[in-house]
Amino acid sequence: MIKTTVVGSYPVPSWLPTCSSQEGLRDAMLAVIKTQEMAGIDVVADGELYRWDINHAETNGMIDFFVRPLEGVEQLLDPERLKVWQEQPGNSFRKKPPGIVVGELAVGALDLQADYELYRGLTAWPKKFTVTSPYMLA
């Protein structure tokens, strides 16, 4: 028998930006999973919501999720650099700066195990955990 599954990211629920917390993220993931179960999908996915970041809603935080852990990237800026960043046109919608390259880029580490643990207990159905493809990172 051929099993059904889904591909790609689910849209972020409209209420998540106003309820952005670990509990809100868990509830959003649960809504995505239960929707798939009710539709009869055999192998469910979390909709890639584990990458959500309220500070970077225009990309759901997906780009920063992969960039922040790299060596040579900082997100915490000294007050002077933070002020310069905040004054740039187009940054007013962000609460925090994105990852900013401050040196030579080098290998970083993702904690995908912790992200999977957030999702694992939400369903007894067969599940898959999505990681991005290399072209997204290029």
Indicate residue ranges for each PLM-predicted region.
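Domain-level signal for soluble alpha/beta catalytic cores
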Residues: 1-138
